[in-house]
C-alpha cells in the first residue's frame, strides 16, 4: 500500500484554521479495515482509488443515496470517512476519478455482504469461507425470524454462534440436528432461507467439514433415540428369572454401545481430534450413551413376554420354599425354641436368616453357601456365649473373694466386741455380787450389800451422850418412856428370852444379860450414825436376824466401812 494515501495537501484558504483542526484517525482506521479485508490480488489490480482525497459531503451526495438504498445491510465505513474528512482540516479538491473509486468501493462492499449472507452470484466469495483469518460465518437458526440491520450486532452474534458450532462438531452432530429442528427438502424453503440451508452450512471451514463427512447410521439412531420421549411405565412385579434376563440384556447393550463407540472412532477419516476436544467430548458422549442404555432397557422391560415354563418352575420353587419356611417355624414353635411363628419370620439373628435363605435356595450351590454361613454364625454365637459365661464366672469369683474378706473382717470385729462385752460383764459381776452367796451359812464370803443412795440431807455427826436423854427428841428418850415400835415387829428369840414382862422397870437394864444389852447398844450406835434413815433400818433388821456372834460381827464391819466411806 502506498503511503500517498496518508498525505494530504493543505488548502491555502484553511491555513489560518489549521491549528484548530486536527486529522481524525477514524477515517484512517476505516480505510485500513476495508483494505485488509480483501485479498492482495484484488487490491493489486487497480490501486489508483487509494490516491483519492477525501472530499466534501456536498460532492458525495450520490454515494450517500447509494448507501440509503441498502439500509438493511448498512456499513458505515465510507460515510464515516467522509465525515472525518469534514471535521479535519483536509484540503478540498474535485476530480472525476472520485466517483469511480467510490462506486468500485460500493461494488466490493456489496460482494463482501453477499459472501457473508451466502447468496453471491459468482463462486469466488463462496470460496472465501475457507480462509482461516476471515470472520465470515453462518448465521444461527435461532435468528432467522429477526432481520439484521447493524454490522456490529451481526459480527457479535456470529462470534457466539461459532463457539456453539464448535461444541456441535466436537460432539459429532451438525448444528441443525443438535437444535432438533425439522430438515426441509423442498426447494422453496432453500431459496427463501437466505442461504442458510444445509447445503451452505457445510462450508464453514475445512476443519469442520472433515468431521461431518460420513455420519454413521449408529449415530443417527442414537440421535433419534435420544429425542424420543422416555417411557415411564415399569413393571413392578417381576420374577427372579426376569430380573436376571434384564441384567444380562443391560450388559449386552452396554457392550454393543462400547463397540459402536470404538467403531466410530476407528472409521473417522482423519484420526482422533485434539486432546482438548477429547476432554470436552467425553462427558457428553457418556451422557448420550447413558440415555440410550436406559431407553433400550426400559423398552425391553415394557415388552410383556408370555409366561414360559421357567417362570412356572421358579414360582413353584418359591411356593415350596415358603411352605418349608412355615413348616420350620411351626416345628420350632412346637419344640419350644421360639415363642411364635411370627417371631421366627421377623428375627434378625444371623443363624435364623441363613436358615431361611437355605430353605428358600433354588439350587445346591446356594444351599451349601447358606449352610456354611449358618454354621459359622452358630459357632460365632456359641463363642460369644462362652465368653459371656467366662466374664460372669470371673465376676462371681471376685464377688466371692470380696465376701470372704468381709466375713473375715466381721468375725474379727465380733470377737473384739465379745471380749469387750465379757470385760463389762465381769466388772458388773464384781460390783453387784461382791463375790458371795447369801444362801450358804458356812460361806464366809461377803453378801451383797449395794444400796441405792437417796438425796436425803446429811445429818451432822453427833456423838452419843447419856445427857441427850433429857432433850426433847424422841430418839434420845430412854426405852421405858418412848414407844418401842421396832420391838413389836422384830421377833428375835435372843431378845425375847428374858423379856416376858412387858411393863418392866428401869432396873431391868441392870439385869446382867449380855446379848440383850449388846444388841440394844448396837442399835443405839446404828441409830446415832450419820447414815440415812433407810440404811439405818436395813442395818437394824440385819442385826436382829443374826443367829451367831460372827454374823453380828460381819454386819458391824459393813456398817463401819460405810461410815468410813462417808467420813473420808
Swiss-Prot record:
<comment type="similarity">
    <text>Belongs to the respirovirus P protein family.</text>
</comment>
<dbReference type="GO" id="GO:0003723">
    <property type="term" value="F:RNA binding"/>
</dbReference>
<dbReference type="InterPro" id="IPR016075">
    <property type="entry name" value="RNA_pol_Pprot-P_XD_paramyxovir"/>
</dbReference>
<feature type="compositionally biased region" description="Polar residues">
    <location>
        <begin position="190"/>
        <end position="208"/>
    </location>
</feature>
<feature type="region of interest" description="Disordered">
    <location>
        <begin position="434"/>
        <end position="455"/>
    </location>
</feature>
<dbReference type="Pfam" id="PF01806">
    <property type="entry name" value="Paramyxo_P"/>
</dbReference>
<feature type="compositionally biased region" description="Polar residues">
    <location>
        <begin position="107"/>
        <end position="121"/>
    </location>
</feature>
<feature type="compositionally biased region" description="Polar residues">
    <location>
        <begin position="294"/>
        <end position="305"/>
    </location>
</feature>
<dbReference type="InterPro" id="IPR043097">
    <property type="entry name" value="PProtein_oligomer_dom1"/>
</dbReference>
<feature type="compositionally biased region" description="Basic and acidic residues">
    <location>
        <begin position="239"/>
        <end position="253"/>
    </location>
</feature>
<feature type="region of interest" description="Multimerization">
    <location>
        <begin position="344"/>
        <end position="411"/>
    </location>
</feature>
<feature type="compositionally biased region" description="Basic and acidic residues">
    <location>
        <begin position="151"/>
        <end position="167"/>
    </location>
</feature>
<feature type="region of interest" description="Interaction with the nucleocapsid (N-RNA)">
    <location>
        <begin position="479"/>
        <end position="568"/>
    </location>
</feature>
<dbReference type="GO" id="GO:0006351">
    <property type="term" value="P:DNA-templated transcription"/>
</dbReference>
<dbReference type="GO" id="GO:0019079">
    <property type="term" value="P:viral genome replication"/>
</dbReference>
<feature type="compositionally biased region" description="Basic and acidic residues">
    <location>
        <begin position="7"/>
        <end position="23"/>
    </location>
</feature>
<keyword id="KW-0175">Coiled coil</keyword>
<keyword id="KW-0597">Phosphoprotein</keyword>
<feature type="compositionally biased region" description="Polar residues">
    <location>
        <begin position="441"/>
        <end position="450"/>
    </location>
</feature>
<protein>
    <recommendedName>
        <fullName>Phosphoprotein</fullName>
    </recommendedName>
</protein>
<feature type="compositionally biased region" description="Basic and acidic residues">
    <location>
        <begin position="132"/>
        <end position="144"/>
    </location>
</feature>
<dbReference type="GO" id="GO:0003968">
    <property type="term" value="F:RNA-directed RNA polymerase activity"/>
</dbReference>
<feature type="region of interest" description="N0 binding">
    <location>
        <begin position="33"/>
        <end position="41"/>
    </location>
</feature>
<comment type="function">
    <text>Essential cofactor of the RNA polymerase L that plays a central role in the transcription and replication by forming the polymerase complex with RNA polymerase L and recruiting L to the genomic N-RNA template for RNA synthesis. Also plays a central role in the encapsidation of nascent RNA chains by forming the encapsidation complex with the nucleocapsid protein N (N-P complex). Acts as a chaperone for newly synthesized free N protein, so-called N0, allowing encapsidation of nascent RNA chains during replication.</text>
</comment>
<dbReference type="InterPro" id="IPR002693">
    <property type="entry name" value="Paramyxo_PProtein_C"/>
</dbReference>
<feature type="region of interest" description="Disordered">
    <location>
        <begin position="1"/>
        <end position="24"/>
    </location>
</feature>
<comment type="subunit">
    <text>Homotetramer. Interacts (via multimerization domain) with polymerase L; this interaction forms the polymerase complex. Interacts (via N-terminus) with N0; this interaction allows P to chaperon N0 before encapsidation and form the N-P complex. Interacts (via C-terminus) with N-RNA template; this interaction positions the polymerase on the template.</text>
</comment>
<feature type="region of interest" description="L protein binding">
    <location>
        <begin position="412"/>
        <end position="445"/>
    </location>
</feature>
<feature type="coiled-coil region">
    <location>
        <begin position="387"/>
        <end position="416"/>
    </location>
</feature>
<feature type="region of interest" description="Disordered">
    <location>
        <begin position="45"/>
        <end position="324"/>
    </location>
</feature>
<keyword id="KW-0693">Viral RNA replication</keyword>
<feature type="compositionally biased region" description="Basic and acidic residues">
    <location>
        <begin position="58"/>
        <end position="105"/>
    </location>
</feature>
Amino acid at each position: 500500500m502506498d503511503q500517498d494515501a496518508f498525505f494530504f495537501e493543505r488548502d491555502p484558504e484553511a491555513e489560518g484554521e489549521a491549528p484548530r483542526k486536527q486529522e481524525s484517525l477514524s477515517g484512517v482506521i476505516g480505510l485500513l479495515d476495508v483494505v485488509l479485508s480483501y485479498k492482495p490480488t484484488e487490491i493489486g489490480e487497480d490501486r489508483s482509488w487509494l490516491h483519492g482525497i477525501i472530499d466534501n459531503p456536498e460532492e458525495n451526495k450520490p454515494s450517500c443515496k447509494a448507501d440509503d438504498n441498502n439500509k438493511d445491510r448498512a456499513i458505515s465505513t465510507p460515510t464515516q470517512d467522509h465525515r472525518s474528512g469534514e471535521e479535519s482540516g483536509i484540503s478540498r479538491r474535485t476530480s472525476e476519478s472520485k466517483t469511480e473509486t467510490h462506486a468500485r468501493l460500493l461494488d466490493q462492499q456489496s460482494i463482501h455482504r453477499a459472501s457473508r449472507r451466502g447468496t453471491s452470484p459468482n463462486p469466488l466469495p463462496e470460496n472465501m469461507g475457507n480462509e482461516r483469518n476471515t470472520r465470515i460465518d453462518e448465521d444461527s437458526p435461532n435468528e432467522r425470524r429477526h432481520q439484521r440491520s447493524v454490522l456490529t450486532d451481526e459480527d457479535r452474534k456470529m462470534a457466539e454462534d461459532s463457539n456453539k458450532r464448535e461444541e456441535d462438531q466436537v460432539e459429532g452432530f451438525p448444528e441443525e440436528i443438535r437444535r432438533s429442528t425439522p430438515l426441509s427438502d423442498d426447494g422453496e424453503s432453500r431459496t427463501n432461507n437466505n442461504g442458510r440451508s444445509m447445503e451452505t452450512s457445510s462450508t464453514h471451514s475445512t476443519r469442520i467439514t472433515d468431521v461431518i463427512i460420513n455420519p454413521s447410521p449408529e449415530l443417527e439412531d442414537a440421535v433419534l433415540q435420544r429425542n424420543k420421549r422416555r417411557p415411564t411405565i415399569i413393571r413392578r412385579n417381576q420374577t427372579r428369572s426376569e430380573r436376571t434376563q434384564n441384567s444380562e440384556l443391560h450388559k449386552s447393550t452396554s457392550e454393543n454401545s462400547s463397540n459402536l463407540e470404538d467403531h466410530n472412532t476407528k472409521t473417522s477419516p482423519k484420526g482422533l481430534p485434539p486432546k482438548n476436544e477429547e476432554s470436552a467430548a467425553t462427558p457428553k458422549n457418556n451422557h448420550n450413551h447413558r440415555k440410550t442404555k436406559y431407553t433400550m432397557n426400559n423398552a425391553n422391560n415394557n415388552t410383556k413376554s408370555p409366561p414360559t415354563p421357567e417362570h412356572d418352575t421358579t414360582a413353584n420353587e418359591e411356593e415350596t420354599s415358603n411352605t418349608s419356611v412355615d413348616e420350620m417355624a411351626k416345628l420350632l414353635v412346637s419344640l419350644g425354641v421360639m415363642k411364635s411363628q411370627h417371631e421366627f419370620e421377623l428375627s434378625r439373628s444371623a443363624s435364623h436368616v441363613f436358615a431361611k435363605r437355605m430353605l428358600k435356595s433354588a439350587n445346591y450351590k446356594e444351599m451349601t453357601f447358606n449352610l456354611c454361613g449358618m454354621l459359622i454364625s452358630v459357632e460365632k454365637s456359641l463363642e460369644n456365649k462362652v465368653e459371656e459365661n467366662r466374664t460372669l464366672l470371673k465376676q462371681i469369683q471376685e464377688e466371692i473373694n470380696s465376701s470372704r474378706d468381709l466375713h473375715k473382717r466381721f468375725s474379727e470385729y465380733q470377737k473384739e466386741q465379745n471380749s469387750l462385752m465379757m470385760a463389762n460383764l465381769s466388772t458388773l459381776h464384781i460390783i453387784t455380787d461382791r463375790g458371795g452367796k447369801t444362801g450358804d451359812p458356812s460361806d464366809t464370803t461377803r453378801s451383797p450389800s449395794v444400796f441405792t443412795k437417796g438425796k436425803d440431807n446429811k445429818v451432822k455427826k453427833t456423838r452419843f451422850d447419856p445427857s441427850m436423854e433429857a432433850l426433847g427428841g424422841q430418839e434420845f428418850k430412854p426405852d421405858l418412856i418412848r414407844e418401842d415400835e421396832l420391838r413389836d415387829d422384830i421377833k428375835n428369840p435372843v431378845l425375847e428370852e428374858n423379856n416376858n414382862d412387858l411393863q418392866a422397870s428401869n432396873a431391868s437394864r441392870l439385869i446382867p444379860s449380855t446379848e440383850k444389852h449388846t444388841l440394844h447398844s448396837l442399835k443405839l450406835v446404828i441409830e446415832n450414825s450419820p447414815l440415812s434413815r433407810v440404811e439405818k433400818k436395813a442395818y437394824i433388821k440385819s442385826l436382829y436376824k443374826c443367829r451367831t456372834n460372827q454374823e453380828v460381827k460381819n454386819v458391824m464391819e459393813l456398817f463401819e466401812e460405810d461410815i468410813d466411806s462417808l467420813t473420808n
